[in-house]
Amino acid sequence: MTASDGEEPDVSPADERARESLLPWAGQPAVLLDRHLRVLAATRLARALSPGFRPGVNLVRFTFLDAAGRQDSPSWRAAADHIAALLRESLDRHEGDRGFPAVVGELSATSAAFARSWAGGAPSASSGSVDLPDTAVGRLSLGYRLTRLPDDDSTLVLFEPLDATAREALRRLAVRARRPPASDRPGRPGADPAGRDGAT
C-alpha cells in the first residue's frame, strides 16, 4: 500500500517504535530526530507548528534550503546556527558515519548560509528558545529542550510556551490540529466517515 492509495503508507517497525516513544508527550509539540537530524516521528501538534517537523524531513536541509527565504530574519539566523551546531556535534560523536559527508557536502555547495554557519563553529545548546513567525495561529515563541536517547541514538526535542500568550496560541493550534481536513468532514465528497488521519 502507498500513500497514493488514499491511506497511510506502510509503517516499518522502526517507525512504529519511534511513534510509540512520543506517546508520553502526545499533548505537546515533540519531535524525535536521528543522528543526521532527520525527523523520525513528531506529535500532531509539532507537525502543526511547521512542515519541517514532518517525519522523513531532514531538519538541516529544510532550514537551509526549504526555508532559505527567511534568511534576513534574525530569528532564522539564530535557529540556523543552532541547527548547524547540532549537526556538527552529532558528526563529532559519530566519526566514520558516511551519511554526514553527503549532507555537509550538499549543503556547503548549495547554501552560502550553511557554509557560514558551519564555519562559524557556534556551540550547540541543550535548551533555548525558537521563534516561529508563520504558524497557523501567527508568530509563536517557544522554549525547547533536547534530550539524547542513548538506546536508539536519537534526540528528543520538546517544545513549551514561554508565556501566557504563547500558551494560548498553542492551545488554539492544538484545537486546529485535531480538526480533520475539510475534505474528510462528514457530508463532503470523499469524506472518511471514521475520521482517520493517522496522527499521533
Language model: regions and residue ranges:
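HTH-adjacent hinge/linker in prokaryotic transcriptional regulators
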Residues: 1-22
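Beta-alpha-beta core module
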Residues: 137-161
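Actinobacteria-biased recognition of intrinsically disordered, low-complexity terminal regions
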Residues: 5-12, 168-171, 175-200
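PAS-family sensory domains
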Residues: 26-116, 120-125, 132-133, 150-152, ...
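Short, acidic/polar N-cap/turn motifs at the starts of alpha helices
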Residues: 127-129, 144
